[in-house]
Amino acid sequence: MKTLLLTLVVVTIVCLDLGYTRRCFITPDVRSERCPPGQEVCYTKTWCDGFCGSRGKRVDLGCAATCPTPKKKDIKIICCSKDNCNTFPKWP
């Protein structure tokens, strides 16, 4: 009986994965944080605003449940699903 109970506990722990959550870089501080439960996708969103010529592209890093869809054609979104895979872009 104890063996059956122990087996059930182990199977439950393996199936629940002990509440693992993805880690992604988050802006504005560009630091690694745990994503909220259910958000397993990291994303990097880049776009130009009115100051793009003097300051460069804007960058937004974060977590999402699914890869966000760009609302405008000049917005670029890259998604990934490994811990801290959405590093700040390197500009040429």
From Swiss-Prot:
Domain of life: Eukaryota
Disulfide bonds: C24-C42, C35-C63, C48-C52, C67-C79, C80-C85
The UniProt record lists the keyword Signal: yes
One Pfam short name: Toxin_cobra-type
Keywords: Acetylcholine receptor inhibiting toxin, Disulfide bond, Ion channel impairing toxin, Neurotoxin, Postsynaptic neurotoxin, Secreted, Signal, Toxin
Places the protein is found: Secreted
Cellular component per GO, a single term: extracellular region
Signal sequence bounds: 1-21
Gene3D superfamilies: CD59
One Gene Ontology molecular-function label: acetylcholine receptor inhibitor activity
InterPro entries linked: Snake_3FTx, Snake_toxin-like_sf, Snake_toxin_con_site, Toxin_cobra-type
Tissues where this protein is expressed: Expressed by the venom gland.
Function description: Binds with high affinity to muscular (alpha-1/CHRNA1) and neuronal (alpha-7/CHRNA7) nicotinic acetylcholine receptor (nAChR) and inhibits acetylcholine from binding to the receptor, thereby impairing neuromuscular and neuronal transmission.
Family assignment from sequence similarity: Belongs to the three-finger toxin family. Long-chain subfamily. Type II alpha-neurotoxin sub-subfamily.
Record protein name field: Long neurotoxin 1
Organism the protein comes from: Oxyuranus microlepidotus (Inland taipan)
Lineage, highest ranks first: Eukaryota, Metazoa, Chordata, Craniata, Vertebrata
